[in-house]
Amino acid sequence: MSIISIEKATILDAEKLTELMTKTFDEEVKRWLYGQGDVIDYNIQPPGYSSVEMMRYSIDELDCYKVIMDEKITGGIIVTISGKSYGRIDRIFVDPIYQGNGIGSHVIKLIEEEYPNVRIWDLETSSRQLNNHHFYKKMGYEIIFKSEDEYCYVKRITVES
């Protein structure tokens, strides 16, 4: 089994992370928006997803991690922590050639371990990305809102006393 870890990203990682995020989200466009040229879905194509400058901003201003598998960067996760107990998964991406191997599940667990005081995690995903719905439910997230374009999920972590 491959070793999967997360490390805080640095400015030196910005180009590689941008390359992987662009590859990942462009694949999602092909899968979920094929033939729908006029559709804009900001969960499938988040603003700035292909911009190295935006990745540098994320690294400087947010909690941005690179996903490492077998000493190679294979993805990333960007989170925002508000206060001590609230976290938001802004973006998670895994190189499409490595998807389906449990990397995303492992990364979510690692992020939860990285922030043990966070009791509420939330995120949004496109209503079109059916694989994401299955993934987030598997990870313990519950739908709190859905519209024609977007699903909002939350995960509440209870502390055993």
Ranges and model annotations:
Residues K66, K72-I81, R88, F93:
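Conserved beta-strand in the GNAT
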Residues I81-I92, Q99, N117, D149-Y151:
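A conserved beta-turn-beta hairpin within the catalytic core of GNAT-like acetyltransferases
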Residues I108, Q129-N132, D149-V154:
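Short glycine/proline-centered loop/turn elements that form peptide/ligand docking sites
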Residues E114-S127:
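Conserved GNAT acetyl-CoA-binding A-motif
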Residues P116, K137-S147:
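Conserved acetyl-CoA-binding loop of GNAT-fold acetyltransferases
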